[in-house]
Each structure stands twice: as structure tokens, then as C-alpha cells.
Design a protein with these regions (language model features):
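Cytosolic juxtamembrane helix and N-cap/initiation of the first transmembrane helix
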Residues: 1-11
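Membrane-interface interhelical loops and short amphipathic "cap" helices
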Residues: 22-36, 90-100
């Protein structure tokens, strides 16, 4: 369960997100100011690096607590940013007003929400095993 949870989350934040964002809608968008672009690229590199570390810890060292927590920080950070978006003027909609959704649910919420649920189960199992 722990390996699956971390691997699933890493696949989303270290692979899928860069694939979806290294293009003209994000990194190469003419509508984004340069300062926002540097933050975007920084976030992509940081999250992908965290993901590689998590995979190494889970698959190479069979350690679960730190990779689960790190992955929760990444996915949870997105979820928090999404839910407080009105506070800072954020949006998941593109300039043309469209939004990537699946069955009416934003794909970020669907993916990272699912990953966070798996990660919480992984955290619970990891903590339960440490108490034994």
C-alpha cells in the first residue's frame, strides 16, 4: 500500500504535472509575466526532485514515513492553494475560460485528492507499524 501510494502521487506531481505544464499554457505562455514563469519552473524542478527522492526511499531503502510525508506536502500544498484561490486571485481556468475536468471535477483536485487519500492511508499504516 505504501509503495503504491507514494508511487502514484509521484507519478502525478513529478511526471504528469510537468508534462501538462511545460508548454504554451504555462511555462511558455506569452500571457505569464517572467516572475511567475520562474516560480513555475522552480516548482516543477523542486517537486520532481522531491519525487525522485521519494521513489529512491520507497523502492531502494524501503522507507515509507518521509516519502509519504513529503508527497503529502506536495499534494496537500496544491489542494490548499486550490481551496484558498479566491483569497489571492488564483484560478485553474485557462485564459480562454476552459478548465481541465473529468466528470465535472478539476483534474488537479481529482488526481491530487485521490493521491492524498492514498497517502493518508499509507501514513496511518506506516505509523501503526512503527508503534508495534
Amino acid at each position: 500500500m505504501q509503495k503504491f501510494a507514494v508511487t502514484f502521487a509521484v507519478a502525478l506531481y513529478a511526471i504528469a504535472v510537468p508534462v501538462l505544464e511545460i508548454n504554451e499554457t504555462h511555462v511558455f505562455s506569452p500571457d505569464w509575466i517572467p516572475h511567475a514563469k520562474i516560480h513555475e519552473v522552480w516548482q516543477l524542478i523542486t517537486n520532481s526532485s522531491i519525487g525522485l527522492l521519494c521513489l529512491w526511499l520507497v523502492w531502494g531503502r524501503k522507507e515509507y514515513l518521509i516519502p509519504t510525508l513529503l508527497s503529502l506536502f506536495v499534494t496537500g500544498g496544491f489542494l490548499i492553494a486550490f481551496f484558498i484561490r479566491d483569497f489571492y486571485g488564483g484560478s485553474m481556468k485557462f485564459q480562454d475560460g476552459t478548465e481541465k475536468v473529468l466528470s465535472g471535477i478539476n483534474i488537479g483536485i481529482l488526481g491530487f485528492g485521490t493521491a492524498a487519500v492514498f497517502l493518508f492511508f499509507s501514513l496511518f499504516k506506516t505509523m501503526k507499524n512503527k508503534i508495534k
